């Protein structure tokens, strides 16, 4: 996925229709979705292998160009004859005026499906954890997800998934999923606003879908981590928010690193909250840097910097 930002100004209303005239001044293009998770992991020094599918179009070419910037990583990219996904945001004085999306949500073909399975089986033995970023754009069918989860469990490799599919049967038997508040509420048909409600929703998801851990991202209310042993809630600090796009990707990256390194749950959530707070304070999709994450001399800094392969 490609995240595009067009910065400009509006000084007048169009004579053609009652709409503002946007004068473009600057453009920026960065990886979004799974690409943003990948960038966050690489930024923190994690050796990461990316397996993905893009379209044979200009957006796909730009995605490949951005991926080439990360040389200390592996990339397996299948190019399919379909439209790549992009989100173009037009901003005036830091405020989003409109977002224009381009996408094709049709399921990938048999060749792309086989490509993913082939390289997944090849790479999983070289890595300590699997991270799936499911934006529901046609790559992760229930069949493919079930296959990837089954392979991960057979290899005893933890698999962490950021879900967008409303059918959570697709994520059965996964190690950890990270739904947001809305997704959690929709799948359980319950309110999940308070800590107690979030805990109850997490337990329902775990029991119904045989998922070992649930991390609910609750925006300004923080994070709730639920497993069979305990439930931990981590609140956020009040900060000025400029742009929430990509914050969930950053949380996914941090939690994956901490999980792979057996970091204490409470500290893992504090790190994830801190990282998310850092990126929402910037305009546009951005990544967390080591110096931002560890500037307060967190006690596990040495252990976390000795990060594993994802």
Regions found by a protein language model. Give the residues of each.
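Gly-rich Lys/Arg/Thr-decorated short loops/hinges at beta-loop-alpha junctions or inter-strand turns
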Residues: 13-22, 93-106, 179-186
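Substrate-binding N-lobe of the ribokinase-like
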Residues: 15, 19-86, 296
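Conserved post-catalytic alpha-helical subdomain immediately downstream of the catalytic base
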Residues: 212, 237-296
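Positively charged, low-complexity intrinsically disordered leader regions
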Residues: 1-12, 297-310
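Conserved phosphate-binding/catalytic loop of the ribokinase/pfkB sugar-kinase fold
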Residues: 76-82, 89-124
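Conserved phosphate/ATP/ADP-binding segment of small-molecule kinases
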Residues: 137-231
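A structural signal for isolated positions on well-ordered beta-strands in alpha/beta enzyme cores
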Residues: 49-52, 75-76, 129-131, 160, ...
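Short acidic, glycine-rich surface-loop motifs adjacent to enzyme active sites
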Residues: 127-139
């Amino acid at each position: 996925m490609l995240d595009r930002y067009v910065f400009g100004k509006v000084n007048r209303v169009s004579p053609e229709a009652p709409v503002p005239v946007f004068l473009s001044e600057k453009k920026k293009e960065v990886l979004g979705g799974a690409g943003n998770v990948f960038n966050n992991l690489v930024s923190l020094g994690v050796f990461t292998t990316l397996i993905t599918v893009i379209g044979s179009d200009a957006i796909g070419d730009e995605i490949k160009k951005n991926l080439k910037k990360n040389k200390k990583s592996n990339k397996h990219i299948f190019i399919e004859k379909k439209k790549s996904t992009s989100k173009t945001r037009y901003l005036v004085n830091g405020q989003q005026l409109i977002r224009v999306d381009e996408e094709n949500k049709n399921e990938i073909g048999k060749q792309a499906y086989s490509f993913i399975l082939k390289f997944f089986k090849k790479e999983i033995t070289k890595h300590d954890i699997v991270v799936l970023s499911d934006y529901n754009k046609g790559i992760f069918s229930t069949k493919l997800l079930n296959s990837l989860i089954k392979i991960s469990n057979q290899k005893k490799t933890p698999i962490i998934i950021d879900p967008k599919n409303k059918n959570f049967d697709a994520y059965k038997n996964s190690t950890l999923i990270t739904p947001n508040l809305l997704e959690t509420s929709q799948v359980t048909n319950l309110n999940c606003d308070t800590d107690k409600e979030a805990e109850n929703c997490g337990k329902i998801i775990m029991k119904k879908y045989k998922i070992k851990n649930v991390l609910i991202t609750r925006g300004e209310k923080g994070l709730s981590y639920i497993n069979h042993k305990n439930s931990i809630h981590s609140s956020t600090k009040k900060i000025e928010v400029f742009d929430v796009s990509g914050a969930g990707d950053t949380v996914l990256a941090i939690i994956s690193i901490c999980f792979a390194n057996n970091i204490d749950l409470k500290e893992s959530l504090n790190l994830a909250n801190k990282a998310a707070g850092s990126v929402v304070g910037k305009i546009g999709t951005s990544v967390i840097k080591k110096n931002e994450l560890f500037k307060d001399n967190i006690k596990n800094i040495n252990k976390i910097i000795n990060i594993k392969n994802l």
